[in-house]
Amino acid sequence: MSAIDGLPPLREVIARHDLRAKKQLGQNFLLDLNLTAKIARAAGDLTGCDVIEVGPGPGGLTRGLLAEGARHVLAIEKDARALPALAEIATAYPGRLEVIHGDALEIDPLAHLTPPIRIVANLPYNVGTELLIRWLTPAAWPPFWQSLTLMFQKEVAERIVAQPGGKAYGRLAVLAQWRTEARIVMTLPPEAFVPAPKVHSAVVHLTALPGPRYPADPAVLNRVVAAGFNQRRKMLRASLKGLHPEIEALLIQAGIAPTARAEEIGLEQFCALARGLAAAPR
């Protein structure tokens, strides 16, 4: 890709700008531009799309997104050390890359973007799950984004696509599968990164559905699954008792045995419970 965009290899960029990854920022840099291009392609045809990227670091994925035709990339970067490297990419792609220095958890990107919008990111490990839950649980749906193409630790990716009954099934699976079509599209070994993490990574592609699979208030559903899976080995009548004094009756009304555990309950039943809880007098 260096020959295409006229920019130097990422190892050279990192050395020149002293961009050693910081553990406290959850950084692991992907240096193979062939892999970053592959991740960009996993997001689909980016022509005519605005793209949000969180934690671009030295800009490997940023370059992939721009080379694959993204109309405009909004890169949100907390680490000030990366800004000069990203500015060089912006110069190579005039008018197509906007960099915001700040925390993605505190920034509203919508003022900077024009639909259609996609989110593509090698998320910092320490904020990835929190960002995903925010993107999955807005009050209004469809959301501002068409799709999410996100890299996580492989264990987290497997939790997003997990089915009831297994150890991986939990809050992420329920929230993701309620409103999106989610699938793992790539796995990457530790040695693909600098520094190499201790675990494999995976890219998950989530496409927003036109509407949720079953009706439920997102805040209530999030509260139900958070409580249920926070104490996943407990029976639901115990793990959810803090949500409502008549939780056993609400479970039965939703078709759920009060003695069941969260990992045994499917999406439809969780949504039924959330509806019942929202409608129940306190």
Curated annotation (Swiss-Prot):
Gene3D superfamilies: Ribosomal RNA adenine dimethylase-like, domain 2, Vaccinia Virus protein VP39. GO terms for molecular function: 16S rRNA (adenine(1518)-N(6)/adenine(1519)-N(6))-dimethyltransferase activity; RNA binding. S-adenosyl-L-methionine binds at N28, L30, G55, E77, D103, N122. Pfam families: RrnaAD. Belongs to the class I-like SAM-binding methyltransferase superfamily. rRNA adenine N(6)-methyltransferase family. RsmA subfamily. The keyword RNA-binding applies. PROSITE patterns: RRNA_A_DIMETH, SAM_RNA_A_N6_MT. Specifically dimethylates two adjacent adenosines (A1518 and A1519) in the loop of a conserved hairpin near the 3'-end of 16S rRNA in the 30S particle. May play a critical role in biogenesis of 30S subunits. It catalyses: adenosine(1518)/adenosine(1519) in 16S rRNA + 4 S-adenosyl-L-methionine = N(6)-dimethyladenosine(1518)/N(6)-dimethyladenosine(1519) in 16S rRNA + 4 S-adenosyl-L-homocysteine + 4 H(+). Keywords: Cytoplasm, Methyltransferase, RNA-binding, rRNA processing, S-adenosyl-L-methionine, Transferase. GO terms for cellular component: cytosol. The keyword Kinase does not apply. This is Ribosomal RNA small subunit methyltransferase A. It comes from Paracoccus denitrificans (strain Pd 1222). Its main location: cytoplasm. It is found in: Cytoplasm. Its EC number is 2.1.1.182. InterPro entries: KsgA/Erm, rRNA_Ade_diMease-like_C, rRNA_Ade_Mease_Trfase_CS, rRNA_Ade_methylase_Trfase_N, rRNA_adenine_dimethylase, SAM-dependent_MTases_sf.
